[in-house]
């Protein structure tokens, strides 16, 4: 996490804690000629536009006070989206019983992607139901885990 991302995280936490929101991620990066500070938040039942506005106004005021960014930037506060990667233990817990896709660094059985129902997460291992059988994946070999969205 960059220094600016850490500052933004520290500044936003009080409003998140007060409202029982979860900080999913903070990004500070340049895209084209513009800099973006993106804050992704969530809560049980999902984030609303009003929630995003509340956090955005609060964080904008705090950033103006501290002024840690020398140049102009665009502040965005939003939900992480339905297909956000699962990173934290809580993300995995929320997705028990749901379909996920696992991408690996090193292939297993000549495959680097597996899809199945998440049945357990231990912190070190992900266990899914794959083709009717339990399959374990060591987190050290997992590059990405995301929910499977079916419409």
Curated annotation (Swiss-Prot):
Domain of life, per lineage: Bacteria
SUPFAM superfamilies in alphabetical order: YhbC-like, C-terminal domain, YhbC-like, N-terminal domain
Entry-linked InterPro entries: Ribosome_maturation_RimP, RimP_C, RimP_C_sf, RimP_N, RimP_N_sf
Any one Pfam family match given in the protein's UniProt record, by short name: RimP_N
Keyword annotations of the record: Cytoplasm, Ribosome biogenesis
Subcellular location: Cytoplasm
Main location: cytoplasm
Any one Gene Ontology BP term: ribosomal small subunit assembly
A GO cellular component annotation in the UniProt record: cytosol
Biological role stated in the UniProt entry: Required for maturation of 30S ribosomal subunits.
Family the entry assigns: Belongs to the RimP family.
Protein name, as recorded: Ribosome maturation factor RimP
